[in-house]
Design a protein with these regions (language model features):
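Short, compact, well-ordered microdomains
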Residues: 80-121
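N-terminal domain-onset segments
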Residues: 1-79, 113-121
Length: 121
């Protein structure tokens, strides 16, 4: 069931798109290509809604929908990552479309959605 992103979710995703490091920084050859790719993602932000939440019960991770539709696993997946004191935040992007926001806790800690200022890039 799709729902609108909260303002905190939207800000977190925007910060991840803008500043998070790619797990494979060699995916694109130039800084300009990366900047254009990030700009395309930011322009898509208004079309993103929240889908299914993770069922682990310890994290606020959730599926991202574009135009209220699930994003299919792509041939070209880029993972943007940032750290928080309690864990790791990852934004999965499949074929240029954000597909999942993962907030992975350290050990057995239960996490709430982190504030964008908590991100360590």
């Amino acid at each position: 069931m799709a729902r609108s992103l909260t303002e905190a979710e939207r800000q977190l995703i925007s910060a991840m798109i803008t500043s998070a490091k790619a797990t494979n920084p060699n995916q694109y050859d130039t800084q300009e290509t990366w900047q254009n790719w990030r700009q395309d993602l930011l322009q898509m932000l208004d079309r993103i809604t929240a889908g299914d939440a993770c069922e682990c019960g310890k994290c606020p991770s959730f599926q991202l929908l574009v135009d209220n539709k699930p994003v299919q696993a792509g041939k070209n997946q880029i993972i943007l990552e940032a750290f928080i004191s309690e864990g790791l935040v990852m934004l999965f992007v499949d074929d240029g479309i954000p597909s999942y926001l993962e907030i992975a806790p350290n050990l057995d800690v239960q996490l709430d959605l982190p504030d964008e200022e908590a991100l360590i890039f």
